[in-house]
């Protein structure tokens, strides 16, 4: 059996699954940045019309997925897999969103690599002809991530100048073997990374 591998970490996808559509829903701070005009929607407050930050993140996640599917000319029932995750315990944003969407779900936790991981695995699913459609998604929310990894906002801790600012937003991409709209790109190869410990232990200076 010929393996679809190139070197140690790269896999070739001969069927070249298409990224037929994508969507991004973000918070106000992200909308004020240089990419602001490119997002599908910018929420004007951190709660996004919800009662908690966690519910706000879930709404961003669902909206991004539904928008990507719509832009790809499909309905949720036409999507055969949802691959995605977030930064919270039990990947609750992705899990509860999957429950609402009813799409077969593969939950992923790769922290900052979750979106790329979902595209790699989704591409392999389609190239292996185990599915013809899949949606890949990832999200985070500044207020939920601060509670998870640093200090809850209500604690009032002072942030050092080097502290990272976790994105409030969700992104989704629809993969298809036979897209019904002109594709944005094709996944021809994927390269899986390795874990490299650089010895950075300061949670407030992760870019050191």
Predicted regions and their residues:
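A glycine- and small-aliphatic-rich helix-loop capping segment at beta-alpha/alpha-beta transitions
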Residues: 35-38, 94-105, 126-128, 149-158
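Conserved active-site and cofactor/substrate-binding residues in soluble primary-metabolism enzymes
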Residues: 14-17, 30, 55-63, 77, ...
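Active-site-proximal alpha-helical scaffold in enzymes
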Residues: 109-136, 175
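Secondary-structure boundary elements
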Residues: 70-75, 124-133, 176-184
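Short, well-ordered, mixed-charge alpha-helical segments that flank or form enzyme active sites
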Residues: 91-92, 142-147, 194-199
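Short beta-strand segments
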Residues: 20, 84-85, 134-140
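Condensing-enzyme catalytic core mediating Claisen C-C bond formation in acyl metabolism
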Residues: 1-52, 151-208
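Conserved beta-ketoacyl condensing-enzyme motif
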Residues: 19, 54-113
């Amino acid at each position: 059996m010929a393996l679809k591998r190139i070197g140690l970490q790269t896999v070739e996808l001969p069927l070249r699954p298409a990224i037929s559509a994508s969507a991004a829903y973000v918070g106000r701070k992200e909308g004020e940045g240089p990419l602001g005009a490119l997002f599908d929607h910018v929420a004007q407050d951190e709660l996004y019309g919800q009662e908690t930050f966690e519910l706000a993140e879930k709404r961003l996640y669902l909206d991004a997925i539904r928008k990507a599917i719509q832009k790809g000319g499909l309905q949720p029932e036409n999507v055969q897999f949802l691959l995605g995750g977030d930064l919270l315990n039990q990947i609750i944003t992705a899990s509860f969103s999957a429950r609402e969407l009813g799409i077969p779900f593969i939950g992923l936790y790769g922290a900052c690599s979750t979106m790329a991981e979902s595209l790699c695995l989704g591409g392999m699913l389609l190239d292996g002809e185990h599915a013809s459609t899949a949606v890949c998604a990832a999200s985070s929310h500044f207020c939920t991530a601060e509670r998870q990894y640093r200090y809850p906002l209500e604690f009032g801790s002072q942030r050092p100048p080097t502290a990272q600012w976790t994105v409030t937003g969700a992104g989704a991409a629809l993969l298809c073997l036979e897209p019904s709209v002109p594709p944005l790109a094709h996944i021809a190869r994927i390269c899986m990374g390795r874990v490299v410990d650089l010895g950075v232990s300061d949670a407030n200076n992760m870019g050191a």
